[in-house]
């Protein structure tokens, strides 16, 4: 990686850390925090920083599959997502963050995940987007207080307000994309005050990053004073 001038890596750690604060979460083949530190130091000596991605709000089966954490599920029958309205959700997630940041001390970022998830807050009556932004603001505040820049997968706010599809349709005409945005943009912008400004919105698109719908979305973030980063792999 040094040869190719790579200077930063996001490592999706999930259960591959032997967590000290929530030891049940680490898998049997997980690396210890000290082993991760050695890897981080090795990379740092080569001008490469490693930052952790600790999955939440969804992709949380590595935590919620355990009996101990079942009460934190958004849907009691599914281990996919945390309940963003339960304060204990944040106690657990922050413990995982603390250990991950200790394991990877040279990173600049804390990637909090947040993709491919829709929650109800145990049928709270709040919308999925409202709930996600409640969660996002809390975890972004934690990241900032820990000295890290939070990164968030941006797909769900876009999907829940109807502007997601054009990003993956490079054959869609500019006029059609603009029409979809003109119809739905107001729904997205109604939530703008709740979008944390200290966050990087990571615009992932592995198949059609050049699509007009994708570049238009990235420009929307910039136009509204939000930081955006592309992820093509």
Q: Where are the regions that the model predicts?
A:
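Acidic (Asp/Glu)-rich catalytic clusters
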Residues: 2, 41-45, 101-105, 189-196, ...
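Active-site clefts of carbohydrate-active enzymes
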Residues: 116-122, 198, 219-233
